[in-house]
């Protein structure tokens, strides 16, 4: 990281210990914020507003930033699996890593009911379900390699089918708790555990983006 970036982050960093959430990009943050409104409604606004953007799958950046934090800080870094089947980085003291079981966080938005509610699709329109049945993997190994970003892209198959881009954050908000995949519940379980270890005053930790 350039020296100027380190200085900027140091100026913004609070002196007291804090809980820091690291995510790959703004889209990840918006999806997590939507899920958090359902799973962590009292903590979502502060925590997700102040999540640190890494600018891609860059666990080393999270470690570098976290090492410069105040003693006693805790953190969770949430990463896509991408194409690496063994992608779980080594934990750093106080900083945990969570890697999605599927290739991308967007994979967990491919819930027909949530997409239908988010787009207010008429009940007589069954094109969505037919397309997902044809496109989606049948087993976990298939999901680990499946490119959900392609399917959900602004000009991807679903957008062309439905005649409009898919609003990913709205789909995340429309996903009911019992529709969320076990991986999502596991990640939020890790998040709750970390938050319980910190006083409430330390939830906010505006740190800027590491882009």
Regions found by a protein language model. Give the residues of each.
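Acidic, divalent-metal-binding catalytic cores of TOPRIM
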Residues: 1-211
